[in-house]
Amino acid sequence: METWQELKVTVKREGEELVSNLLIELGAQGVAIEDSMDYVGNVDRFGEIFPEVEQQEEIVVTAYYPETVDVAAVEADLQARLAELTDFMDLGEVKMGTTALTEEDWADNWKKYYEPARITHDLTIVPSWTDYEATAGEKIIKLDPGMAFGTGTHPTTKMSLFALEQVLRGGETVLDVGTGSGVLSIASSLLGAKEIFAYDLDDVAVRVAQENIELNTGMENIHVAAGDLLKGVEIEADVIVANILADILIHLIDDAYRLVKDEGYLIMSGIIKDKWDMVRQSAESAGFFLETHMVQGEWNTCVFKKTKDISGVIGG
């Protein structure tokens, strides 16, 4: 029986998606998240209340590697990459540890962390292996969380989904910048967008997004390609959405203003509290007006509008 290696990385909650993505880039065959916030105050869809769980600042990202991988080298590489990012994000004290698993352990271990999750009024994210029956009006997004790049339950992704639900009415063209898992593109299609163009700089993310899109039926209107933000893009859009780090977001704002149609929207997420003013000022300097601002914990998500009628915007 084949042996697998389990690498556990403990970081502050803000580092969940960053660490998950890096572990996948470093060859992980699956990633699981342990977060006490997933259970605090939760009630499942059948009304059962989860046991009391003490809220922790830290989460555990667990990655799974074949026995042929030098996990010590992965640890060293991950530590080096995280050290380069300390100016952009407070990860706290990073702790790592490894355990050997059998094939059977691996097959069951990471899947136990994922259950169907109702994210917004309309949208529910369902692991690809789950037999789930939707209720009336419920829109299902099937994802393979083992591929990482965003499982849809991180605050930045949740708020992005709420924002899309707010602005999409049907028939729109959407640009999804830094698509990751493809979850925002899939949601846009389910919410009625006519065409979605998804971009990511990471070739692995492009592949993962395409595979997740193929898990969902009727997604032929989503086009995925490698791309560096919006450089070289000439497609006019009704909505542009980007869930990436604030220091990267500010570099796409001018191109977003160029491409978004009049009365169109720019949704930005992935913004920690200390970077919010910087992002807001950059967007307003480009000509956008803030329409909606959402906050969950340390994270900010915003909906900016390109409009001459500022009566309905914040500060208008």
Curated annotation (Swiss-Prot):
Molecular functions (GO terms): protein-lysine N-methyltransferase activity
Top-rank lineage group of the source organism: Bacteria
A Pfam family per the record: PrmA
Signal peptide interval: none
Alphabetical keyword list: Cytoplasm, Methyltransferase, S-adenosyl-L-methionine, Transferase
Catalytic activity: L-lysyl-[protein] + 3 S-adenosyl-L-methionine = N(6),N(6),N(6)-trimethyl-L-lysyl-[protein] + 3 S-adenosyl-L-homocysteine + 3 H(+)
Subcellular location: Cytoplasm
InterPro entries: Ribosomal_L11_MeTrfase_PrmA, Ribosomal_PrmA_MeTrfase, SAM-dependent_MTases_sf
EC number: 2.1.1.-
Enzyme class: transferase
Gene Ontology cellular-component terms listed: cytoplasm
Annotated positions binding S-adenosyl-L-methionine: T157, G178, D200, N243
GO biological process: methylation
Family the entry assigns: Belongs to the methyltransferase superfamily. PrmA family.
Role of this protein: Methylates ribosomal protein L11.
PANTHER family cross-referenced by the UniProt entry: ELECTRON TRANSFER FLAVOPROTEIN BETA SUBUNIT LYSINE METHYLTRANSFERASE
Protein name in the entry: Ribosomal protein L11 methyltransferase
Lineage start: Bacteria, Bacillati, Bacillota, Bacilli, Lactobacillales
